[in-house]
């Protein structure tokens, strides 16, 4: 006698059919169009991804003001460690406030001070709630909680269905476990710590059977700018866990040491990135710089999408996903985003990913079958110049492996920058918002204009504490 389908099976089947019928949600397309229409004409360029690929990012505030590090650069205020955390429901309300602007599969940073200092059950509840809103939460952390508390990451993965994590590692941090990490003065000296995180993340995924997209962040100062070279070499040197890095030139905000902020330009940062990826070849480095894209104002962020090719016996090689605008294949990438902007595979199972791909093909068979094969052939030729069939055979045999890598820079502003003409233009085009008292506020305003400090002061008063209260109760 045939068995009846379980409710779970029926839900999965409905999900597959839904994705096949609508591979890009109408809500996502509407948000993209709204954001594109709101851009000034001079920012509607081929490099512009806002309103084309995505709809920006949101972050929580008050999730855990406390941090157990004492970094040289920090956006938190002096009183942060004496401020009580927001209740879980208040953070959930922030997520609801962000959802209309982020859309389905919207990027949400679960952040504040060090969120992993909250009770695990509360972090898990926040992760679960974000998923219920169709947001994709990325847990922002220094990572040492995972080193000190075995099993914590595994709980987040299995009970909270954590799918994205970002671990901050650089020489500006103070408070690491391990003497070698505490006394490191160069970024290269922290590469063993980065290796440790790779192993930790690999083990957690193997133990739980859950996949985790991992990013790493690095604060960039005048002191460690040259260390970008060592971090990039490590990143492409063979590790297979971190597929995104965010470089953040330091701003003079919060409790950052006086005079420590500023002094690192985007041009200086990106030249070091491109020079490392190109092996010092100036022409190749310049070509990589021409492959950058951005969201909103180009002074706020820069992004380079690519893949790293690993071939036995050869040095790893980075290839930009979107060729420079002069390349004939750049038009294929641009057309893909025009047709399928807003498409997201981030929360897909294998079945829904296949259904989504078929759904895209059914909507534009001429493009998918007519142009994408040529683009794929172009990629094979890049992987093995003059011998694309050999590249295909090597991919099939495993002699050639490829891994995606996204390189990002986020350029937050100090208070003096916010008052300039460009600063005002950047605020008007901000793509990174925090919900504060019912209003979405630019992260730069939150950190540089005292918004965070005032928010924390309100939290303290609501909890019956003063900002200068030193009682342990305020840490809860």
Give the positions of each predicted feature:
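Conserved alpha-helical substructure of the radical SAM core
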Residues: 10-151, 155
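Short loop/turn segments at strand-loop or loop-helix junctions that form parts
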Residues: 63-64, 75-76, 167-173, 247-250, ...
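Short, solvent-exposed loop/turn segments at secondary-structure junctions
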Residues: 68, 172, 221-223, 250-252, ...
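Alpha-helix N-cap and loop-to-helix initiation/capping positions
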Residues: 83-90, 182-192, 261-265
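Radical SAM/AdoMet-radical enzyme domain recognition
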Residues: 95-96, 100-110, 119-248
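Flexible glycine/acidic-rich beta-alpha junction loops that bind and position SAM and/or redox cofactors
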Residues: 173-181, 242-268, 284-311
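Rossmann-like AdoMet/SAM-dependent catalytic core
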Residues: 268-274, 278, 286-340
């Amino acid at each position: 006698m045939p068995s009846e389908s379980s409710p779970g099976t029926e839900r999965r089947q409905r999900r597959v059919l839904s994705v096949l019928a609508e591979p890009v949600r109408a809500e996502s397309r509407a948000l993209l169009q709204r954001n594109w229409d709101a851009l000034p004409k001079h920012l509607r360029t081929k490099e512009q991804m806002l309103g084309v690929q995505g709809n920006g990012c949101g972050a929580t505030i008050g999730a855990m003001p406390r941090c157990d590090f004492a970094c040289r650069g920090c956006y938190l205020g002096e009183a942060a460690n004496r401020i009580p955390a927001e209740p879980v429901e208040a953070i959930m309300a922030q997520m609801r406030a962000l959802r209309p602007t982020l859309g389905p599969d919207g990027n949400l940073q679960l952040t504040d001070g060090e969120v992993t200092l909250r009770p695990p059950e509360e972090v898990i509840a926040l992760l679960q709630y974000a998923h219920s809103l169709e947001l994709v939460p990325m847990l922002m952390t220094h990572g040492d909680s995972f080193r000190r508390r075995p099993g914590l990451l595994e709980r987040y993965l299995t009970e909270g269905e954590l799918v994205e994590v970002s671990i901050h590692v650089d020489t500006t941090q103070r408070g690491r476990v391990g003497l070698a990490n505490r006394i490191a003065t160069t970024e290269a000296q922290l590469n063993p710590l980065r290796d440790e995180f790779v192993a930790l993340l690999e083990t957690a995924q193997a133990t739980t059977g859950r996949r985790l997209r991992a990013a790493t962040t690095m604060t960039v100062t005048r002191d460690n700018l040259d260390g970008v070279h060592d971090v990039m070499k490590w990143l492409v040197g063979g590790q297979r866990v971190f597929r995104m890095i965010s470089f953040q030139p330091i701003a003079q905000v919060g409790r950052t040491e006086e005079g420590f902020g500023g002094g690192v330009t985007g041009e200086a940062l990106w030249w070091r990135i491109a020079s490392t990826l190109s092996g010092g070849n100036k022409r190749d480095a310049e070509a990589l710089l021409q492959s950058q894209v951005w969201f909103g104002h180009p002074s706020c962020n820069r992004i380079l999408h690519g893949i790293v090719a690993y071939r036995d016996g050869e040095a790893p090689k980075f290839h930009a996903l979107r060729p420079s605008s002069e390349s004939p294949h750049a038009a294929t990438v641009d057309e893909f985003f025009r047709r399928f902007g807003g498409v997201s595979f981030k929360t897909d199972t294998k079945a829904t990913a296949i259904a989504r791909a078929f759904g895209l093909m059914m909507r534009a068979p001429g493009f998918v079958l007519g142009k994408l094969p040529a683009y794929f052939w172009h990629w094979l030729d890049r992987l093995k110049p003059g011998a694309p069939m050999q590249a295909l055979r090597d991919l099939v045999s495993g002699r050639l492996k490829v891994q995606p890598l996204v390189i990002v820079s986020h350029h937050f502003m100090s208070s003096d920058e916010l008052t300039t003409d460009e600063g005002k233009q950047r605020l008007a085009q901000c793509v990174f918002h925090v919900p504060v008292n019912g209003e979405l506020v630019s992260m730069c305003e939150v950190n540089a204009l005292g918004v965070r400090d005032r928010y924390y002061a309100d939290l303290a008063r609501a909890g019956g504490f003063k900002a200068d209260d030193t009682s342990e109760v305020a840490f809860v």
